[in-house]
Structure formats: C-alpha cells, structure tokens
C-alpha cells in the first residue's frame, strides 16, 4: 500500500482496532458529565451534551439541555453516528479478521463516511447554537468535546483506508505474485 514498508496483513487487525478506539472516544464524548464547554475559570458555568450547570463551589444548579431542539438534534446525531460506527466495526471484524472479504471494504468505508458526516454536523451545531442561545462570556471547549472530534477524525482516517484497501487485495490476502527485477544484456 505504501512504499515505506507497511505490511498489508497487519492492516487486517489495525483497522478494526482503530475503529474500536473511535467507538471508545465516541462513548466518552457522549457520556461525559463534566461538560463539553466551561466558562473561562471553570468555576461558574459548564455544559455537557445533556445538561448545563451554574453555581459556585459545591452548589450547582443543573438544567437539562434537552428542552432545546438543537441539543436533541446533537444528541440524536452523535448517537446515530455511534450506532453506525459500531455496525461498521462489527462488519470490519467479519470482513478482515476471520476471512478476508474485500467486497465488504468499500461498504464499510461508505458507512464510516456517513458516520463522519453525521458527527461533524453534530459537533458543529453544538457550539454554534450554544453561542447563540446560552453564551454569557468566554468559554473553553473541554476534553469531552475533543474526544468527539478525535473519534470523528479516527473514523475519517479509517474510512479513507477502507476505501483504498480493495486496490491491494492480493497483498492483503497474501496472494501477491513475486516481482523479479533483472536486466538482460
């Protein structure tokens, strides 16, 4: 695949493992309660995908963000992206780890591209709508929001690789013909 010496047979195990990491990152982003955004000092206001909390010290007043349609859309899109990602992971295990089924690889790539599109939409809607409706000063995006972007970037990379792998079917399956370089003269 690349001239720098990547072994094709290792791709059979690396790609599902990368998808597993993307799933874990997505779960962390979706389940995080500490917030996707927090105020500048992280002392008076923070908001996760599900709720926003205001207060000081240990006295926090939390309200659900699910009353906003944009927050419901973000939650739905992130969960749909996670479900598509899990489905693609299961298919990749079947396609690559038991027997190499190269015909499934472009389908997995398309599923992953769909998951990327859905999650990018969610990750863009959240800060735009948060700034329009809740913004009260300077906010920082936290590690949980970063995990959402990390999962999306990993998924995009895997999608590209899954779309490119069918070109290297003989190398992946180990049926590559030996190429001899010689000069006649």
Curated annotation (Swiss-Prot):
Bilayer topology: Multi-pass membrane protein
GO cellular component: cell-cell junction; cytoplasm; desmosome; plasma membrane
Transmembrane segments annotated in the record for this chain: 13-33, 74-94, 105-125, 143-163
Effect of a null allele: Morpholino knockdown embryos show a decrease in apoptosis in response to UV irradiation during late blastula stage embryos (4 hpf). Gastrulation continues normally, however embryos show increased levels of apoptosis at the end of gastrulation at 10 hpf and develop a severely malformed body shape from 24 hpf onwards when cells in the skin and fin folds appear rounded. Significant increase in apoptosis of cells in the skin, pectoral fins and notochord at 30 and 36 hpf.
GO BP terms, alphabetized: apoptotic process involved in blood vessel morphogenesis; cell-cell adhesion; regulation of apoptotic process; response to UV
Induction field: Induced by UV irradiation of early stage embryos, this is partially dependent on the presence of tp53. Induced by tp53 expression from 10 hpf onwards.
Alphabetized UniProt keyword annotations: Apoptosis, Cell adhesion, Cell junction, Cell membrane, Cytoplasm, Membrane, Transmembrane, Transmembrane helix
Functional summary from the UniProt entry: Component of intercellular desmosome junctions. Positively regulates apoptosis in the early-stage embryo in response to UV irradiation, this is partially dependent on tp53 activation. Required for the survival of cell populations in the developing notochord and skin, therefore required for normal embryogenesis beyond 30 hpf. Acts as a positive regulator of endothelial cell apoptosis in response to blood flow-derived shear stress.
Family: Belongs to the TMEM47 family.
UniProt-recorded name of the protein: p53 apoptosis effector related to PMP-22
């Amino acid at each position: 695949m690349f001239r720098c010496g990547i072994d094709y047979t290792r791709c059979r195990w690396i790609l599902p493992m990368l998808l597993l990491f993307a799933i874990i990152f997505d779960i962390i982003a979706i389940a995080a309660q500490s917030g996707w955004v927090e105020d500048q000092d992280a002392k008076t206001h923070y908001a996760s995908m599900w709720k926003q909390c205001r207060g000081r010290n240990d006295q926090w007043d939390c309200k659900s963000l699910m009353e906003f349609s944009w927050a419901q859309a973000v939650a739905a899109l992130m969960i749909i992206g996670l479900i598509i990602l899990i489905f693609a992971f299961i298919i990749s295990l079947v396609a690559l780890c038991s027997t190499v089924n190269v015909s499934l690889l472009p389908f997995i790539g398309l599923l992953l591209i769909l998951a990327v599109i859905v999650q990018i939409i969610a990750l863009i809607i959240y800060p735009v709508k948060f700034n329009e409706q809740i913004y009260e000063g300077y906010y920082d995006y936290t590690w949980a929001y970063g995990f959402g972007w990390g999962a999306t970037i990993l998924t995009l990379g895997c999608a590209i690789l899954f779309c490119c792998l069918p070109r290297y079917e003989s190398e992946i399956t180990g049926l590559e013909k030996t190429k001899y370089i010689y000069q006649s003269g």
